[in-house]
Amino acid sequence: MAEGGELMSRLLSENADLKKQVRLLKENQMLRRLLSQSCQEGGGHDLLPPRAHAYPEAGSPGSGVPDFGRFTSVADTPSQLQTSSLEDLLCSHAPLSSEDDTSPGCAAPSQAPFKAFLSPPEPHSHRGTDRKLSPLLSPLQDSLVDKTLLEPREMVRPKKVCFSESSLPTGDRTRRSYYLNEIQSFAGAEKDARVVGEIAFQLDRRILAYVFPGVTRLYGFTVANIPEKIEQTSTKSLDGSVDERKLRELTQRYLALSARLEKLGYSRDVHPAFSEFLINTYGILKQRPDLRANPLHSSPAALRKLVIDVVPPKFLGDSLLLLNCLCELSKEDGKPLFAW
């Protein structure tokens, strides 16, 4: 039964397609016959009146009137009358296959191709006219292609985005304010990310300032090369000898600080490079923070929440460890978290 029902539905669809093709053939033949009759009737008549002499005699009615304007106005009237009469004739014979159309609105679309064909060509609508006439002029095409060509297609227009307040309607003012708030939030997110890099930078500066007291210019000093810088600082520039006392003192300070930080989980093999990674990734603050206007930079809890919001989970544990180390050193020296 299922196969029989499928066969019947297939036969019905093929029958409907055949009826459509027969209807298109009839309309095509009628169109060609009417066009040939109109061409035969208008072939013997000259639409343009005989051209006047280039130099009319004196006192003639046509003297002083330009020829081209007169001929253009006279020639337009018969062509317009002939086009309109032929259009009405075709539209009256257009619903040739009304037995196939069940809805009362089917006759109107059938008249549209004829009117589009007979109407004078417009520069902006000739594409749509050619698309609608193509099934009538080539009835041997596939019925599926004809169906797709007859269906109206919507023009895809690019969306216009504007931010000027004068060009936006009243209802779109909220949309504009939303876009501006989003831009400001992106700027705020970038600033918060710089705070993460500033935490790593401040920790490195605290470590270097503790190991090398009295050294104001730390250009070229990093936590990773502290042992090398201890030897370089302990070497006298005059004779190249090593100041053993200074070397021993700097080494003891470095080992004592490393022992305190290792209790918090800090590793001399991992976290110096990780601090450089955070600084290069997020950057540092461009100007000195105002602690009275923004107490975020002096609150360990607020900084911890910011790090959780900004840093991805893969680097979150080590980033929080650097913050804990910075807070511990800030408690020992009594200075703010972000010391400038």
Swiss-Prot record:
Residues 123-133 have a biased composition (Basic and acidic residues). Its main location: cytoplasm. GO terms for cellular component: centrosome; cytoplasm; sperm head-tail coupling apparatus. InterPro entries: SPATC1, Speriolin_C, Speriolin_N. Pfam families: Speriolin_C, Speriolin_N. It comes from the Eukaryota. One of its GO terms (molecular function) is protein kinase A regulatory subunit binding. It is found in: Cytoplasm. Keywords: Cytoplasm, Phosphoprotein. GO terms for biological process: actin polymerization or depolymerization; positive regulation of cAMP/PKA signal transduction; spermatogenesis. The modification Phosphoserine is found at S60, S134. Residues 42-73, 94-135 are annotated as: Disordered. The keyword Cytoplasm applies. Belongs to the speriolin family. Highly variable expression among individuals is associated with differential sensitivity to the DNA alkylating agent N-methyl-N'-nitro-N-nitrosoguanidine (MNNG), decreased expression being associated with increased sensitivity. PANTHER family: SPERIOLIN (PTHR22192), SPERIOLIN-LIKE PROTEIN (PTHR22192:SF1). This is Speriolin-like protein. It comes from Homo sapiens (Human). The lineage of its organism: Eukaryota, Metazoa, Chordata, Craniata, Vertebrata.
